[in-house]
A protein has these predicted regions:
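Short, charge-patterned binding micro-sites
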Residues: 35-36
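A short, hydrophobic beta-strand-centered structural micro-motif
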Residues: 39-48
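Charged, amphipathic alpha-helical segments and their flanking helix caps
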Residues: 1-32, 47-145
Length: 145
């Protein structure tokens, strides 16, 4: 069995990079958030690869990738709206009933792209309030060879 998680994460990155805006500014997209990163931004990381079915001729996996939108405001200011607006753009680009990532050149067939839930979190620090929208994005992937 081959591991396609990194291929899905790359496709997610490519789909979002340069395409999500808030207040006329394009959000940065990261796989690793640099110390120089500034809010708001999008953070993408892999969660799991669950082998859902296998037989003598193929493996089918459920790949879970998390996509987070993180915004920050001075303590007791701001709100979740920017996270919700950015997440709305993200789900429109990623979640589909009929068109999925093309991984055929890597010997995979993607035939599912689902929103497995969006979680909204508010975190207070000494100086800021962070608002996070976290999408659990599931792709169903078949290894073709």
């Amino acid at each position: 069995m081959k591991e396609p998680s990194y291929l899905i994460r790359k496709k997610v990155y490519d789909a979002l990079d340069g395409n999500i805006t808030l207040n006329s500014a394009t959000l940065s997209v990261y796989n690793v958030v640099p110390s120089s990163g500034s809010y708001p931004y999008i953070y993408i990381y892999s969660i799991s690869n669950d082998n859902t079915e296998s037989n003598k001729s193929k493996y089918i996996s459920s790949i879970t990738t998390r996509i987070e939108v993180i915004t920050a405001f001075d303590t007791n200011t701001g709100g979740q709206l920017d996270c919700i607006l950015a997440m709305n753009q993200i789900t429109q680009l990623l979640v589909s009933q009929s068109s999925y990532f093309d991984l055929s050149s890597d010997n995979f067939n993607v035939y599912g792209a689902r929103n497995n839930g969006i979680t909204y979190i508010t975190e207070d620090t000494d100086t800021q309030t962070l608002y996070r929208a976290i999408l659990s994005f599931e792709s169903t992937v078949e290894q073709t060879s």
